[in-house]
Amino acid sequence: MKDLPKLKSGRKLAVPVAIWTAKLESGRKLAVLVAIWTALVLAPFWTPLLGGYTALGTRVLVLGLAAMSVNFLLGFTGVLSFGHAAWFGIGAYGCGMILKFVALSTPLGIFAGTLAGGLAGAVLGALIVRRRGVYFAMVTIAFGQVFYYIAFQWSSVTGGDDGLRPFYRQPLHLGVTTLDILNNAVAFYYFVLFCFALAVAAMAFILRSPFGRTMLAIRENERRARFLGIPVELHIWIAFTLSCFFMAYAGSLYALVNNFADPRGLHYSQSGDFVMMAVMGGMRSFWGPLLGAIVFVVFQDYVSSVTINWQIFIGFLFVLVVLFFPRGILGAIRRRVAP
């Protein structure tokens, strides 16, 4: 009986300790978030000091968004798609066709490309949502290759192997001023960063919502989620569709980066690159795919300037990461800095 007050006192002490631990973790996450956005905002100023250039940072943002789109489905729902390059390419072609044939409007091109890719993904998702595992992945590859060969063969519309060109991103008229995103690389970087921030905010909002928690429940145990009455197929279809919209959005931005769209953007090898970025960075973390894209794009840019066989070195790097950092680069960093 004399020990009871000690136990009670211990419990009282445990409460503030838990609160302070939670506050410390929250403060750490906030500090990391501030560091990430500060680095992105100041990238045009510090990348040249490291031998980089502004356009490289722009490519990192766009491909990082594409990798995060794949991870939205793979990392948080547990569904692997090897055909996401199809929506990336459709977004690029949709944006390019608007700028080339319809109207000289950058926002309209982005909107049209995003809508085209997202709706195409929604239709396909409704057809294959009951497939799982390798069957789902193979069906997405097959449909992706269908779109690839359409773009490759329909040369009168898509330009065939040469791609859709020429079209150019147009200046943005912001009331009293005009932002020249065609000739000013820094201005274009900040425009892409703004678009990137909108997509990231939307992803974060969805993942923090009840729907996002349901996605995680399906990832962890689909059978249990189904037993609890969750309409699994509906949630997977919605997650797949949202992922396709984000991917098409990234594809639209990529068309603006290059001022052309070509069939290679729809090829399954491009899907493999996106999955590789997500896995290298850490596919069960929100920011991991962006880190993977940074490593992939910078490594590719450097090695390709030395040898045309840069894919060999990228593959070797990927194998090393998978063997020694199974949770990705970000996962390894978290383990090392964790108290």
Enumerate the language-model features and the residues they cover.
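Cytosolic-side transmembrane-helix boundaries in multi-pass membrane proteins
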Residues: M1-L40, T214, I218-R223, F227-H235, ...
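Membrane-interfacial amphipathic/re-entrant helices at transmembrane-helix boundaries
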Residues: M1-L65, G94, V102-G109, N184
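Helix-loop-helix "hairpin" substructures at the membrane interface of multi-pass membrane proteins
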Residues: S9, K29, L182-D262
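Single transmembrane alpha-helix segments in multi-pass membrane proteins
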Residues: P44-F101, L127-T140, M215-I218, E222-R226, ...
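Generic structural signal for small/hydrophobic residues in well-ordered secondary structure
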Residues: G57, S81, G94, G121, ...
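Transmembrane alpha-helical segments in multi-pass inner-membrane proteins
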Residues: A85, I110-F111, G121, I236-F324
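Alpha-helical transmembrane segments within multi-pass membrane transporters and channels
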Residues: A92, V102-Q145, L291-A293
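Extracellular/periplasmic helix-loop junction at the C-terminal end of a transmembrane helix
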Residues: F143-I181, G212, A332
